[in-house]
Regions:
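Hydrophobic, regular-secondary-structure patches
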Residues: 41-125, 132-135, 150, 168, ...
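N-terminal Sec/SRP start-transfer signal
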Residues: 1-30
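Short helix-coil transition/hinge motifs at the ends and kinks of transmembrane helices
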Residues: 68-79, 198-214, 265-274, 278-292
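Hydrophobic secondary-structure segments that place a key small or acidic residue at a functional site
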Residues: 108, 119-235
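Alpha-helical transmembrane segments
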Residues: 29-40
Length: 293
């Protein structure tokens, strides 16, 4: 044993340059592997951050008609009625594994039906939200107050605006206490809200630009019980589901869509609830990143 070690040491010493180059190659190889793994991990974390808004862990589930997202403002030319969700389905979603919270909401995008005096709320969004929406989506009240249960029970015509909508509609005025018109109905602004993170998306496509444009124009929110006053009865709702971790977002979104599709014959009906495809968004981002190099 000792003799073998002595011979090995003599061999290394007699071929110092070759031994040095061999060790250098091994060191460079190990360092390269570490660098590649670190880069992949960093890219994966960036993709996760792009997809979820830096830690919100929420996934949207939207009603589709055929290959397109359903737009309640225009309906469908074939006259078929969209499916409606129930409170029981919401509770079933909340009870799914890895779900922390869930919310149903009505929505109109690029809304032109909201006014403050002579100012139109062009390009923003209006949501009819339930009591879970603000906490699920990470909103905090900046001024005034949020919705309380009596606002829902008594169908009070009150509204919340986010900070972007406050800037665009009120031009520096304090919006709390002001009256805005939504679908020809007066609503009193009771609070200003803002999402707790200051996430700025990494815009790479026109769809991402449109989404970001709506975000910077702002959002107006009213209690979901008041939605029929401003818009229509029996409009379909979409959902936001909060997972307990980023790794469970895809499975949670898929499971929630299955619950929401209960009662819909998805083989014959063109209506179907679909969750955001988190993995496909990740693959698209990777391709865009690679093509831009």
């Amino acid at each position: 044993m000792l003799e073998n070690m002595r011979i090995s040491i003599q061999g290394i010493w007699s071929h110092k340059m070759r031994s040095f180059l061999t060790m250098l190659g091994i060191i460079i190889g190990i360092a390269s592997i570490i660098a590649i793994v670190s880069a992949i991990k960093g890219t994966s974390e960036q993709i996760k951050e792009d997809l979820i808004g830096a830690g919100n862990n929420t996934v949207s589930v939207s009603l589709n008609y055929g290959d397109s997202e359903y737009d309640p403002e225009y309906g469908m030319s074939d006259g078929t009625a969209p499916p409606l969700l129930s409170d029981q389905q919401k509770e079933d979603i909340k009870n799914l594994d890895h779900v922390q919270n869930a919310t149903f909401f009505y929505s109109r995008t690029y809304s032109s039906s909201v006014y403050y005096e002579n100012t139109s709320f062009q390009g923003g969004s209006i949501y009819g939200i339930d009591a879970n929406y603000l906490s699920t989506c990470g909103y905090m009240v900046q001024s005034g107050r949020g919705f309380v249960q009596k606002d829902y029970d008594n169908m009070r015509k009150v509204a919340l605006v986010d900070s972007n909508a406050a800037d665009n509609l009120f031009s520096g005025e304090n919006p709390v206490g002001k009256t805005i018109e939504i679908g020809s109905e007066p609503f009193t602004v009771i609070g200003v809200v803002q999402q707790s993170d200051n996430y700025q998306p990494n815009i790479k496509t026109i769809d991402e630009f449109n989404e970001y444009y709506q975000m910077i124009m702002g959002t107006v929110m009213i209690p979901n019980k008041c939605w029929p006053m401003a818009f229509q009865f029996d409009e379909p709702e979409n959902a936001v589901v909060k997972a307990d971790s980023t790794d469970n977002m895809s499975s949670v979104g898929s499971a929630a869509a299955d619950v929401m599709n209960q009662g819909i014959d998805t083989n014959s009906s063109k209506y179907k609830y679909k969750a955001d495809d988190i993995m496909q968004q990740g693959r698209n981002m990777q391709k865009l990143s690679e093509s831009s190099k």
